[in-house]
Amino acid sequence: MEPSPDAPRAGAAEEQPGPSSSASAPAPAASSNEEEGRHQSQAQQQVQEAQPQPLAQQAPAAAGLSRYESQKRRDWNTFLQYLRNHKPPLTLPRCSGAHVIEFLKYLDQFGKTKVHADGCAYFGEPNPPAPCACPLRQAWGSLDALIGRLRAAYEESGGRPESNPFAARAVRIYLREVREAQAKARGIPYEKKRKRGAAAAAAAPPVVVAPPPVVTAPDDATGTSGGAGEDDDDDEATHSGEQQDTTPAASPTTPPATSVGTTTAAATAAAAKGSAAKGSATSS
């Protein structure tokens, strides 16, 4: 018998291979690759968490950030980059005052301040008339301000104040030596900044305050008692004057009675003498 037209198709269908084991094998391999990638990403996250993060990544940037805060973040990120590029690489917990001093010396190559050497002809002159071959350095004021910002940034990033490498005694000594050396080389003495309260008090005009009266205890007692006595005398005089005004008989302007009688008798005698004289003249 000849095969029906559908027979070859059925045979062909039977001859088509089904899904082989090699085709189903990539599924477990892909899952294992995903697990390995997941483990690697977790390990990277742990390493990043262990390393100190820049201040820009620790907190979102605030709107209207001050100039000081912006400069502090830039300085902190620069220091972290210096630690990563250090040979061998350094971590922040292992950083000490000696590493901070190395960082300050590393920054001298970017300085813009001329610091004359001991053998320079312009050593100690603040305004040299001509250029010289002395190197450029970071000014002491810039280094001092930089250490202040890094010291604050270290504590803001989670560091403990007692382990702050920027507050180490060696760093303070180094800054003092740099200040003295640059003051001699440049001929510019550095003066300590006055506090704001002292500067305001010096700038304010002097306030004239009247001295308090000097009072002695015995004089005070005597004066008080004397004043009280005078007040009492004045009051008594006032009362006596009022009594004199209300009593006419006691007025000092009223003449005594005896003087009035004597004056009247004298007037009568004078009148009698005048009458007698007129009578004698008439009779004659």
Swiss-Prot record:
Motif Nuclear localization signal mapped to chain: 192-196
Q: Which GO terms describe its cellular component?
A: nucleus
Q: Which UniProt keywords apply?
A: Developmental protein, DNA-binding, Nucleus, Transcription, Transcription regulation
Q: What is its main location?
A: nucleus
Bridged cysteine pairs (disulfide): none
Q: Where is the composition biased (Low complexity)?
A: 13-32, 40-63, 246-284
| Location within or outside the cell | Nucleus
- The residue ranges of the ALOG domain are 67-194
One Gene Ontology term of the molecular function aspect: DNA binding
| InterPro entries per the UniProt record, alphabetical | ALOG, ALOG_dom
Any single GO BP term: mRNA transcription
Disordered: region residues: 1-69, 209-284
Top-level taxon in the UniProt lineage: Eukaryota
Q: What PANTHER family does this protein map onto?
A: PROTEIN G1-LIKE2, PROTEIN LIGHT-DEPENDENT SHORT HYPOCOTYLS 6
The protein's name in its UniProt record? Protein G1-like9
